[in-house]
Amino acid sequence: MPYRSMPKFDTGLVELGDGIYAYLQWDGGWGVSNAGFVDSDDDGLLVIDALMAPSMTQEFVRAMRTVSSLPFSKLINTHSHADHTNGNQFIEGAEIIAHQNCRNEMLDAEILAREAAVKSPPRGDKPAWIRDDWWEELAVVQPSLPAVTYGKSMSIQQGEHELTLEYRGEAHTTGDSLVLFADQNLFFSGDLCFFMPLLFAEEISRTG
């Protein structure tokens, strides 16, 4: 496969395991991230990450509703970046879970000030990486912070699946979570892995 090329795929759901789904977004560029969820008759839907623009998360919700009408029970934020947390408010009723550093980053005064400059009039110049069709949408985003945090690891029983949140240290941010499903031999990595580059240590690069 040529350098930096990737196979074409459609935006939508892919079933990875028993009741475990990934939601993929073409083309995976800046701010166009993936997410996932677990469908459990006993415990509702556990969602892994929200998305950047409200319309993106709302489309993700519509896709989940083609599988299940169960209420949302939990939402895991794998890290603090906007393309994984902006849509938190649209996963209605879910208890938000993340690493403690993720929550701290979301509360960081500098980050909140930067977000406010983007979202509040007068809004100034649009950052180059934000798509034109997102620009007005982002003004309605309200911060929705994790209510439950952990330090090293955390186990969650979701129906028949036991999943583990693990913190392996500073990487893409200071608070990245791996979401491991040992019984299915799969995991969700957030932005710990990219198609290209393999690793993008954004917050760590800023802080040295």
Task: Place the predicted regions along the sequence by residue.
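Short Pro/Gly-enriched beta-strand edge/turn motifs at strand-loop
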Residues: 16-22, 133-139, 159-165
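Acidic/histidine-rich helix-loop elements
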Residues: 23-31, 108-118, 197-206
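Active-site environment of divalent metal-dependent phosphoester hydrolases
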Residues: 30-32, 54-55, 80-86, 103-107, ...
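Active-site HxH/HxHxD metal-binding segment of metal-dependent hydrolases
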Residues: 56-57, 62-148, 155
